[in-house]
Each structure stands twice: as structure tokens, then as C-alpha cells.
Amino acid sequence: MKTSTNKPNEEVRAFAKNIRMSAHKVRRVMDQIRGRPYAQAYILLKFLPYKACYPIFQLLNSAAANAKNNMSFKKELFVSRAEVNEATSSKRFHFRAKGRSFCIRKQTCHITIVLKQLPEQ
């Protein structure tokens, strides 16, 4: 997992590349946490019954740790941007009857999470 901070004191990004899951299945979970406060997203990921929650949960914790340790954010955080992009897919062949074969595509995806501080009221 890669992390970067392009804009100082504004946002923290965390990337996970080549996760061995379909982007469509990961988007189902990312739509649930987008725009929510960190604590609420943490609880949602802990209890949602999808396999895609685990890598997103790890990535969210990594981004929060970077916000605390590298950027010294002390206020509440929220998920400002959460996106999933398709990555390369590897092809495997499944051999069938009568000399035929079918192509099986093993899909991967890239996940990006951006955390920001909640604006002061």
C-alpha cells in the first residue's frame, strides 16, 4: 500500500494496487463509506458481510495512521474521496470436453482513499 501527501495540511491519500478482486464488487462497498466520517466508515467496514471490506478496512486504517503521524491531524477525519479503478486482468484457461477451452479472467483493481479534516464550524 502506497501513501502520499500532495497538498500539505489538506488531505491524506492511501493507495492499494493490484488487489485480487473485481472492481465491481469493491465499488459496492466504497459507495457505502464515501463522504462519511472516519469513525462511521470504520464501524461500517467492520460489520458489512462482504469479502471486499477487508482490504478497504486496512487501507482506511493506513490512511488514518498517516494523517495522525505524518500530517499531525488532530481533528475528526472524513472520507472525501474513495474510488476504485480496474487494473490488469490475467487470463487462465479452463479445459472442457471435446477439446474445447474457455478463458477465465482473473480481475484486479486499484483502490484510492482520500481523507480530509472536517471543516470547523
From Swiss-Prot:
Any one Gene Ontology BP term: translation
Cell compartment(s), UniProt: Plastid, Chloroplast
Main localization (coarse): plastid
Cellular component per GO, a single term: chloroplast
Keywords from the named record: Chloroplast, Plastid, Ribonucleoprotein, Ribosomal protein, RNA-binding, rRNA-binding
Entry GO MF terms: rRNA binding; structural constituent of ribosome
Entry keyword Ribonucleoprotein: yes
Protein's UniProt keywords contain Lyase: no
Signal sequence segment: none
Highest taxon listed in the record's lineage: Eukaryota
Function text: This protein binds specifically to 23S rRNA.
Family from the record: Belongs to the universal ribosomal protein uL22 family.
Subunit structure: Part of the 50S ribosomal subunit.
Cited NCBIfam families: rplV_bact (TIGR01044)
Record-given protein name: Large ribosomal subunit protein uL22c
